[in-house]
Regions:
Chain A
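The feature captures the beta-strand-to-loop junction immediately N-terminal to the Walker
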Residues: 39-41
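Helix-to-loop junction immediately C-terminal to a conserved catalytic motif
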Residues: 54
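Conserved ABC transporter NBD signature motif
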Residues: 62-74
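Conserved ABC ATPase signature
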Residues: 131-135, 139
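A short, proline-enriched helix->beta-strand linker immediately N-terminal to the Walker B motif
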Residues: 150-154
Length: 255, 500
């Protein structure tokens, strides 16, 4: 069953009398239980697609459906992990998580309990009282994950969540997230992630959606049914990599 | 004892005005930044109010308040507080507006995605994020407040002069007596009070405010005693609940769209009627013969203002360069500037004018304008210098970009937006100072030079003439702002922006 559906989404801006379209009639279906990765060159409007799908930005044309219903505004059943963490600098790790729980109207005691539970889950126990500025990038993104998970959403959007981290930290965090995701401990039913790292896309996804450069269109989709954990040096992995690479290059040439 | 009570009254006035400015500035800035429809009229209005010499309007405000309170002291006190308020508030409101306007996009998106409503967003995210700007701008605002305090304690209404107890009045008294010791002690008191506020209040607060900056790194600053005290002794929960109640009251009011919009039309009609009557009254002959003197006087003052602003920029540069070379000195320069800026140069002015004599009064006037404008360029340029990304400075060092080349290609372009902001505010400050620079009254003797300020003072006895002068001046300044400063600023802000 489709949890999320984007129908003929177009986003355009008018600047100095000129019409710029960033996204051109994109269709996307996210099924329940699926981890979909959107890849595309930088500036292709991937992040905008995610923001439209989460209801933060309204499309110029087209319609977003969540569980078959048109989405009127920010989706209360979704949460987002941001590329640059988007943590509040004057709040501690725990307060950052409690803040979004408070915004959802959760009473104080339960806020603390939930916050601590998710701090634990992402491996940040004993850092509850640290300020974001005192944490490394990887730890900051752990807070970002804990915060996104703490509101117990049905769908999780991730906007280049590992792009600001160094390679090893990114690999660690990626693996931990996949463990959590496959363990079934989370409330999340589907994940939509944006990245420009094609290896990361194949490592994580059930399905990859490839976007062209601006104005972006869907140029192809690849199902990835390799068993997890995936080996980047396996033959199957490499053949998907080649296929994906060819798809991206061809979208460039056809321009 | 006399000085102590004078100091008490002055401090009370300044701080009441400051708290009102703070409240008003935050509300105004946030309201303007959050809604494009409001922004369209609130920001031009703020621009005009900020650039118009408030001292020119002071006689009008005093007349109204004295009339309302039938000449009782409370009316005069309110007039004085109002004057100080108007000198402090725009700076804060503008800072608040700019901060909310340039709010990090991912934080705003985060707030939206987690379902924070605008009420929650303002209370929990915007207001704390404003703390660095507010604290930084408060230093300027308080210094400017002292400048105007001196002018506000002695109020002239036509031929009547009224004095409020305070340091400004005390100083004028000593000047009239020629009591040098008294003058020095008064100035010492002012400097001491300011040094204390800067050292014990703002220095720790500036350090602490680093906690509220997006993208700051390193260990978190410690909480100063005053913050802990405020946190523990004020029932913020209660205040927040009251605030919510007011806001929800506003929401219910908004639901009655029909009543509200009809009420708005009634208000518009009333305002329009009032304005029409005002125009009729203003344009009705006979005209005072002195109106023809307005253009010539305006130009004389404009010329002096330009010289003063130019000097302010030149004098600020050494400090800025020092601040960039050794960023640890910034706090010291800031404290020094805030303390020096609070020394109300206005009170020395009569002495200086007397000693240089009538022939050189023009030079003395430019000097006074300088004291009214220098702090603005200095504070703004310091702020701009601090905001240059450290990678740019490191790049310059690394590639050996030095000397003239460094200033021409890196430092000046990088600070241009804040330099222009500083110039615009300094321009306003100099105009303000013009209101007191062009005429000095020594009892029997009057020293006066050509200019819009002296014209204005001579017109205080006739409301209509006064209004003509004030209006002409306002229009002139607004004209220059929109056709010169604004364009330059927009151009610079677009071209010399560090964000990609």
């Amino acid at each position: 069953m489709a949890l999320l559906e984007l129908k003929e989404i177009t986003k355009a801006y008018i600047e100095k009398g000129k019409y710029f379209s960033v996204i051109d009639e994109i269709d996307l279906v996210v099924k329940e239980g699926e981890l979909v990765v959107i890849v595309g060159p930088s500036g292709s409007g991937k992040s905008t697609v995610v923001r439209i799908a989460a209801g933060l930005v309204s499309p110029t044309k087209g319609q977003v459906f969540y569980k078959g219903q048109p989405l009127p505004g920010p989706n209360p059943n979704a949460s987002i992990v941001f590329q640059n963490f988007a943590l509040i600098p004057w709040l501690t790790v725990q307060e950052n998580i409690e803040l979004v729980l408070e915004a959802r109207g959760i009473p104080p005691r339960q806020r603390i309990r939930t916050a601590l539970k998710y701090i634990d889950l992402v491996g940040l126990d004993s850092f509850e009282d640290a300020y974001p500025r005192e944490l490394s990038g990887g730890m900051k993104q752990r807070v970002g994950f804990a915060r996104a998970l703490a509101v117990e959403p049905e769908i999780l959007f991730m906007d280049e969540p590992f792009s600001s981290l160094d390679v090893l930290t990114a690999a660690d965090l990626r693996e931990e997230f996949l463990k959590l995701w496959t363990s079934g401990k989370l409330s999340i039913r589907s994940v939509v992630m944006v990245t420009h790292n094609i290896e990361e896309a194949i490592l994580m996804s059930d399905r990859i959606v490839v976007l062209s450069a601006r104005p972006s269109k869907v140029v192809g989709e690849i199902e990835v049914s390799l068993p997890r954990p995936r080996d980047t040096h396996s033959k199957e992995f490499e053949s998907i990599l080649d296929h994906l690479y060819a798809l991206i290059v061809s979208s460039h040439i056809s321009k | 004892m006399y000085l102590l009570s004078a100091a008490f009254w002055s401090v009370i006035r300044i701080f009441i005005a400051y708290f009102v400015s703070l409240l008003f500035g935050i509300v105004y800035g946030v309201l303007a930044a959050m809604n494009p429809r409001r922004e369209r009229w609130m920001i031009p209005l703020l621009d005009v109010l900020q650039s118009v010499p408030i001292l020119g309007f002071f006689p009008i405000a005093v007349s109204i308040l004295v009339f309302l309170f039938r000449g009782q002291r409370i009316g005069l006190e309110l007039a004085a507080i109002f004057l100080i308020f108007t000198s402090q508030v725009w700076n804060i409101a503008f800072g608040v507006y700019e901060t909310v306007k340039t709010f990090p996009r991912d934080i705003a998106e985060m707030a939206l995605s987690f379902g924070m409503n605008s009420n929650f967003l303002v209370k929990r995210i915007y207001v704390p994020a404003l703390i660095p700007t507010i604290i930084y701008n408060s230093g300027v605002s308080l210094a400017v407040g002292w400048y105007f305090l001196m002018a506000s304690e002695i109020i002239t209404l036509g031929n009547v002069e009224i004095r409020l107890p305070g340091l400004g009045t005390a100083m004028m008294g000593y000047v009239a007596q020629g009591n040098l010791a008294g003058m020095l002690i008064t100035v010492g008191t002012i400097v001491f009070i300011n040094w204390c506020t800067q050292w014990f209040l703002f220095r720790p607060l500036i350090e602490w405010s680093d906690l509220f900056k997006f993208g700051a790194v390193g260990s978190a600053p410690e909480e100063p005693g005053i913050v802990a005290f405020l946190r523990n002794n004020i029932r913020w929960e209660k205040i927040s609940q009251h605030l919510d109640r007011i806001l929800s009251w506003g929401e219910t009011l908004r639901k009655h769209q029909k009543i509200l919009s009809s009420l708005r039309y009634v208000l518009y009609a009333a305002l329009l009627g009032l304005f029409a009557y005002f125009l009729y009254w203003l344009l009705k002959p006979p005209y005072s013969p002195r109106l023809v003197e307005i253009p010539e006087n305006l130009i004389a003052t404009t010329f002096r203002v330009i010289v003063a602003v130019g000097l302010s920029i030149l004098l600020s540069f050494p400090f800025v360069i020092k601040a960039i070379r050794a960023s640890n000195t910034v706090k010291n320069i800031y404290t020094l500037a805030a303390t020096m800026g609070s020394v109300p140069a206005v009170i020395f002015y009569p002495l200086i004018v007397r000693s240089v004599g009538r022939e050189y009064m023009g030079v003395a006037a430019v000097l006074l304008l300088l004291t009214g404008s220098l702090w603005y360029t200095l504070f703004n340029m310091l702020k701009g210098a601090l905001m240059i990304p450290s990678t740019i400075i490191e790049m310059a060092n690394n590639f050996g970009v030095r000397g003239f080349l460094y200033y021409r290609t890196i430092l000046i372009p990088a600070m241009l937006p804040s330099l222009i902001t500083g110039t615009i505010t300094a321009w306003g400050g100099a105009w303000n100072a013009s209101m007191v620079a062009e005429e000095v009254n020594f009892g029997k003797e009057i020293f006066s030079i050509h200019g819009i300020g002296s014209l204005l003072l001579s017109a205080t006895a006739q409301p209509k003439e006064l209004l003509w002068v004030v209006l002409a001046m306002t229009l002139w300044i607004v004209f220059i702002n929109t056709f010169f400063w604004k364009r330059w600023y927009n151009h610079a802000a677009e071209k010399y922006n560090f964000s990609e």
